[in-house]
Amino acid sequence: MAVKIKLTRLGKIRNPQYRIAVADARTRRDGRSIEIIGRYHPKEDPSLIEINSERAQYWLSVGAQPTEPVLKLLKITGDWQKFKGLPGAEGRLKVAPPKPSKLELFNAALAEAEGGPTTEAAKPKKKAATSGAKKAAKAAEPEAAAPEAAEPEAAAPAEGGEQAESSTES
């Protein structure tokens, strides 16, 4: 049975993503495969190429023939050179720089805005001792302010220029 290492297409229109699969040579492009040994995403920058080198070496050693696109990918990763015993087995695969974590980005933005990260919450928690003293002070204030508040209301005229007494007439 002739075995090929080929690409099976996944993804949406204009956004191809491929699996590198080992399959019978007579199966269709996206047909049943024997084993998936890697993946290839050409639209990412740089292109994502992941190949299980150990499995690729095994399938090449038992006679699996790579298709032209897979042969190019194997040369980029260095698996083809390793199989043939050629120099350059390390490959020339470009690797994307690692993305910074969201926590690092948040701390950097916070440092830029305020001068340094803080570990405190946005609203400080109310302490029980200070809240008890504030409640006692607030309770004393309305008692003292109540007689003063009643006098200005009686002296001020109601809306529309009418006195409060005229509203009691029937």
Swiss-Prot record:
Record key words, sorted: Ribonucleoprotein, Ribosomal protein
PROSITE patterns the record matches: RIBOSOMAL_S16
MF GO annotations: structural constituent of ribosome
InterPro entries according to UniProt: Ribosomal_bS16, Ribosomal_bS16_CS, Ribosomal_bS16_dom_sf
Ranges where the record places region Disordered: 114-170
Regions of compositional bias (Low complexity) in chain numbering: 142-170
GO biological process: translation
GO cellular component term of the entry, any: cytoplasm
Protein family: Belongs to the bacterial ribosomal protein bS16 family.
Protein name: Small ribosomal subunit protein bS16
